[in-house]
Every structure is written in C-alpha cells, then in structure tokens.
Amino acid sequence: MGCLFYCFQYQGNEILKKWGAHVERTKKTSIGTELLVNALRDQGAEIIFGYPGGAALHIYDEFFRQNVNHVLARHEQGAGHMADGYARVAGRVGVAVTTSGPGATNIVTAVATAQMDSVPLVVISGQVTTSGIGKDAFQETDVVSLMTPITKYAYQVEDAKDIPRIIKEAFYLANSGRKGPVLVDVPKDIGVQEVALEDIDDSFDLPGYNMDHEVDLGAVAAIKEALLQAEKPLLLVGNGVVKSEAHQELRDFAHRYNIPVTHTLLGIGLLASDDPLNLGLAGMHGTYAANMALMETDCLLNIGSRFDDRVASNPDNFAPDAKIIHVDIDLAEIGKIMEPDIALLADAKTALGALLQGAIAGWSDKTDWLAHQAANQALHPTRVPEMTDAIRPQAVLDYLGKATDGQAYIVTDVGQHQMWAAQYYPYQFPGQNLTSGGLGTMGYGVPATIGAAFAADEKHPVVGIIGDGGFQMTNQELNIIQHYGIQPKFIILNNTVLGMVHQWQHAFYSDRYSHSEFGSSLPDFVKLSEALGVKAAKVTDPADMQAAVDEMLAYDGAYVLEVLIDKYERVTPMVPSGKANNEMEGLS
C-alpha cells in the first residue's frame, strides 16, 4: 500500500512540475487545456461557474492565463445550479467545471436536475491521470459511468487533439433536440499533452443523432381533422414549447381557433396569466378550470409535455373521453405514459408552424365549450386570501407581481412556496418561472437565482422564492454576490417546517409530523445573510408586508427578505397522488 501510494505520489509530483513549468506555445503546437479554453470560447461560452481542485488545476491555470470570466461557487452543486439558472435565462449553454472525485460527485444532483428539465449544460470535470484511472487513485471516481444515465452523453478525453471536436460536439448535443447536460471528463495528463495544430480536426459526424426530422404532413392533417371534429378541444403545453421558443406560434394558433390552453409547471408563461384562453396550471396543484377541462375534453392536443405524474396522476383515468394527440421532439416520450391516437415527432416550433399553414377548413368556434371554461374559472378562481393575524404567502406573491408589473424572473426552490409562486405570480412570458420541475431539487433556489442574475437584463429583476428548508441547503452561495455586482433578490417564506412534507403528513399520515419541524433550531436568517455579505430584513406583521417588499425591490444591491408565515398554511387545491384530475381537494 505504501509503495503504491509513494509511486503514485511521485508520479503526480513529476506531473505537477510539468504543470508548474512554463510551456512554450508556438503557432505550431498547443496543449490540452489551451485547446479546451479556446474551444469553449469558440462555442460562445461567456461565463463559467466552477470550483477548482487537484485534478482541475491545469484547467484553472489556463483560465488564469486567458483571463476567463469565471464565477467561484462555494460548492460544486451550487456551480451546477448557477449554470442551470444562467442557461435558462440566457437561452444558451451553461458551463460548469469541477475537479475529480468528490468535486464530480457533488455536481451530480445539479446535472440530474438539468437532465430532467432539459437544460443545456456542458460540465467539465478534471480527472486523475490516464495511468491512474481504475486504480483507486486519490480523488478518482468513475464519473463517466456515474453520469451516463443523467446526461445526453458523457465523454472522457483520451487524446488532447480530440478536445476541440469533443467540446464542439458537446455544445451541439446539449443545445439540440431535447436539450440537456453533457459531461466532458479531462484527465490531468491530457490537459498538458502537447499537440501539433495541424493534427487537429474539429469536424464531427453523429450518424445516430439526426435532429432534422421532416414533418409528417399526414399527421399534421390528421391533427387538424381531429380538432375540426371535436366539440371540446384543449391544448396542454409544456417545457418543449418553451425550449423551442414557440410561444408566439402557440399564441397565434390558440387565438386563431379560440382553443383553451392549460400548461405544466415548466410551461408557465407560454400564455400570459391574464390571457382569457389560459386556464392555468394543470395537475396536482392546478386550477379547477384546467383540471376539469382535462377530464371533459374530447380532443387533447399535448405539445411538449411528458404526461408526467404531476399532471396525469392517474393515467388510466386521464382525459378519459378524449382523442389523445402527442407532439414531442423526443420519441422516447411518445407512448411512454399515454398511448396517443395521433403522434407527431417534431419540435414544437416546427409542429405549430405546420399547423398554422393553411386554415382548418370548416372551423367554427366552440362557443358552448368556451362559455363552460369561463364558468368554471368563475366558479373556483385563484383567490388571494385576506391577511389578518399572519402574513399569507399567496398575498406576498400577488403583491410581488403588482410591484414588478409581472416582469420579474421568479426562481423557486422546491416545496409549498414553489406552488404558491406558480399559482399567484402573474407571469407574462415563457421561461419566466425557473424551478426544478422534474427532479424537485431542494437547494436549487439560491444558486439558480444567482446564475439567472448573471443573464437577466435591467427590465427583468430576478427574485428567488425560497423556503426555510431549501435556504439552509445552499445559502453559502450568497457569499459570491458581493464580488460580481449582481442584484438578485430573495424572499424566504419561513414557516419553520418542511412545508410540503408537513402538508402531506397532515393529509396522509394523520398529523404525525415526523422530523419535519425545525422550530427554534432555525438560524437567524437575517444575521446569516448579512454574514455572507447580503443585506437582509425580516417582516412578521401583515401591515408591513407591502412596504418590506417595496424596500427589497428598491434596494440597490442584493437583498434577502425573510417573511414569517404560519406553519399550517396549505397549498390548495390538491389532486391527491393516484387520483383523477377532477378529484380535487381544498377548492376555494
């Protein structure tokens, strides 16, 4: 054991000597890390989020040499979520860098979050030397095997001359088709390998990855015919429409034919909240109108949504009388949960463009169906409760919407506050609500808010809505804000419990609140935030809530506002897991 460690340590020191020495770079040669940084720049990377370590020092040395715009996270998970938040707002590939071993494993949750929500990321991990791989070297992890199930592809570079091609491929894969994360694992010796520039060829061919699907015009015609024959047509739209930037085509199509629309959590903002055709959120915490429409429709056109269990909790009794039409860019999603009557493999923008070509002959507005939707919206509207003794979180989100004219990027963590943000903020544009919709990652909120703030413009403030539980997971990332001049705002809705866990323990476990209450053990969030370099305040009186929100928004800098709410506040309505969408509880 000692000999193996000594031999590896000696070999590592020899490599370190090479790293530390100046490498003469002529116009005829380059080294792996220089090729890496140049390739990132060629692909349009403007900012990198990361955390250095032994196996990534060669990469970070090149960052120093080339003055790379890098944000030093306080944890690799934070770096991944920052890259995620940045990517969602910027509409480009986010880039994160880690070291090997624990650095790579720490970012796994962020990568899985991006994969579930189709966020384009390129994650670069340092790795031990190629001679040390498979020998349990210090900080070695088989990160390629670890990340293969949660990425679109996981590379390990075997020759430095391949780096330009691999980075080019990685960006293409991440940002095409169904978008998602890609891993590039770079061993230390590959980073310092010298390469003749004449040997580099960054061209690539991915014969098994063809995103140029021709639209099936027969399927388009069948969709139009099905809509024509329907008396109760309904559109269900999701993240696929957001990712393909097809919101205008969606709005044009819905309004041309006056078809009501419901959306998933990640489809928020595709229609403005006050659009009369927008029935609101579908599924577990969706609106009465949306869920009833899903159960009553006779023709459901799903574009860019997966029929996941938060929308279709009981697939056997979901849209039971409807002809099901599924449009998706990912063939694996079609028929996975709901077997469609008509399927169209296409991205949402292409599909909606084809559906807009030529009017549906003989179309007449479904006036009775539209009137029924208006009646359902009036029967159980999304009401903002009055505040008496305690601040109501619904009122906080409603007032925040008024104070920002519905123009803020809202970034949430996961839990009750996530649902209140979905229900009560008046969204106006797609991609405006950043949240961990698929994986449900607590701890996403703080770093994703920071990442989003690096990409947002002055017209769209960035506000993180965080629970006291999620804030405790990644609050350390607040410490970076003071170094970069960004101005994200954070609202902590503090109910002193794990709110959604608490709610489910009430509903399904006879009020047995097992290990879900923090009580007096919570830290002082104001002092904690200030210690991390961010101005903070706390509000407990309903009469002071609006002024506190106004002060937060007006402050010239980052700001944390802690809002104390009641621990028995519930998210309503709710479709219990496994129930049909019309079996809602807690209707107003």
Please report, for each region that a protein language model flagged, where it lies by residue.
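Short glycine/proline- and acidic residue-enriched helix-loop micro-motifs
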Residues: 150-153, 205-208, 374-389, 532
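Phosphate/pyrophosphate-binding active-site segments
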Residues: 23-27, 321-416, 542-546, 551, ...
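A general structural motif
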Residues: 75, 135-136, 210-222, 282-286, ...
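Thiamine diphosphate
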Residues: 138-139, 335-337, 343-345, 349-355, ...
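N-terminal alpha/beta PP-like core and its mobile active-site loop of ThDP/TPP-dependent enzymes
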Residues: 19-362, 403-406, 487-490, 508, ...
